[in-house]
Regions:
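Residue(s) in the substrate-gating loop at a strand-loop-helix junction
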Residues: 143
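C-terminal helical subdomain
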Residues: 183-184, 202-248
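Substrate-binding pocket helix/loop in short-chain dehydrogenase/reductase
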Residues: 96-98, 105-107
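Conserved glycine-rich cofactor-binding loop
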Residues: 13-15
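Conserved glycine-rich Rossmann-like NAD(P)H-binding loop of the short-chain dehydrogenase/reductase
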Residues: 29-43
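The beta1-alpha1 cofactor-binding region of Rossmann-like NAD(H)/NADP(H)-dependent oxidoreductases
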Residues: 59-71, 103
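Active-site helix of classical SDR
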Residues: 121, 159
Length: 251
């Protein structure tokens, strides 16, 4: 159990973020649930409490530096420390050929997936380095697309590859301060973003075929395991995916 420890989960209003928040709360973490919409965050906190845990909701836009700074100022004021950051917030662009993609669509994915993770990690480092005792853990939400792309997914795939570089850099930079960083690469968790998969999605050969999904709660348990390790151990990378999905052999 992680009684008394503070976890911050971005994108906590639904899907993997909510699943991770609830599992962490069940394990004794106090979860700061972060997202852009108030009502879904309130539902996440209520579910944390139904599971016997505790949580609080904070609205913030991870792509906005000022919003992220305000978020972490509140964490410092309310809790005095941060033991875990789960950089989960993410988005994707329409699945169109790259020459049909608007620059604004590209930029939005970069702003949320990559810059948002950087902004939160930057603030977390500042808090984790100076708190007493110092140290903490960051877990970044990557994707199986950090290894193998889908067709028409340039913004998403590029940002998830970049998350891998960010994860490794943070892991190295955090060593002197007891800050660990790892990455969970997820494939086809059942969330609003993957709702279309059982009906059929575009494959590398141009065909449309259904794909299996897995319960997001399984990902929540994986995140909680990574978070539960002692300070002298770290899962640098973990891949968890729906059994039978086209990943190995994809393309």
């Amino acid at each position: 159990m992680q009684d008394g420890k503070i976890a911050l989960v971005t994108g906590a209003g639904s899907g993997v973020g909510r699943a991770a928040a609830v599992t962490l709360a069940r394990d004794g973490w106090h979860v700061v649930a972060v997202g852009r919409r108030t009502d879904p965050l309130a539902e996440t906190v209520a579910e944390c409490e139904r599971e016997g845990g505790s949580g609080s909701a904070v609205t913030a836009d991870v792509s906005d530096p000022a919003s992220v700074e305000t978020l972490f100022e509140r964490v410092r004021a309310d809790h005095g420390r941060l033991d875990l950051l789960f950089n989960n917030a993410g988005t994707a662009a329409p699945p169109v050929p790259v020459d049909e993609l608007d620059v604004e669509q590209w930029q939005r994915v970069v702003d949320v997936n990559l810059t948002g993770s950087f902004l939160c990690a930057r603030q977390a480092f500042g808090l984790m380095k100076t708190q007493d005792p110092s140290g903490g853990r960051i877990i970044n939400n990557g994707s199986v697309s950090a290894h193998v792309p889908r067709l028409h997914s340039a913004p998403y795939t590029a940002t998830k590859h970049a998350i891998t570089g960010l994860t490794k850099s943070l892991s190295l930079d955090g060593r002197p301060f007891g800050i660990t960083c790892g990455q969970i690469d997820i494939g086809n968790a059942s969330t609003p973003l993957t709702a279309r998969m059982p009906e059929g999605v575009l494959q590398a050969d141009g065909s449309i075929r259904p794909e299996p999904t897995m319960d997001a709660a399984d990902v929540g348990r994986a995140v909680a395991y990574m978070a539960s390790l002692p300070p002298d151990a770290n899962v640098l990378t973990m891949t968890v995916m729906a059994n039978g999905m086209p990943f190995i052999g994809r393309g």
